[in-house]
Amino acid sequence: MRCRLLLPLVILSCAVCGVSAGEWTPLFNGKNLDGWIPKITKHEAGVNLHDTFRVEDGILKVSYEGYPEFDGQFGHLYSEKSYSHYLLRMEYRFDGGMMPDAPHYVNLNSGFMVHAQSATEMKLNQNFPVSVEFQFLADEGKGHRQTGNVCTPGTLIEIDGET
């Protein structure tokens, strides 16, 4: 099965490795967004509204600081290339808070999505791509939050014949 990676998160480094290849292939060049397609709800694929996704000091960052309000504008960043039979290695961290009008569940919430529909296949007002997401959740200071959850927007996962 082929997939596209989308990374709505702050990435410090990111690479994939073919199972048999043994060598890591960087996905992010550390300089710019070449090879990546932004998709933000309510906007066409390829529009990087308010510079949501940016590169600063070699770090890929996601920021909503240019938005007057969140207004349901979920952001996703797609790799232009498709991958299969891969391992993914990355470093990430959360920095800053959320917008006042954003839903509570997006606070310190990010992840990467695989086996996803493409950015151009998403409808204009579609919040999340049909995909499998490996979710990152940070501590909000209210007690432990489970991280590494699997979310399946628009999909079902079958394990041992059960969904």
Task: Give the ranges of each region predicted by the language model.
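Bacterial N-terminal signal peptides
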Residues: 8-17
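Bacterial N-terminal signal peptides that target proteins for export
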Residues: 1-7
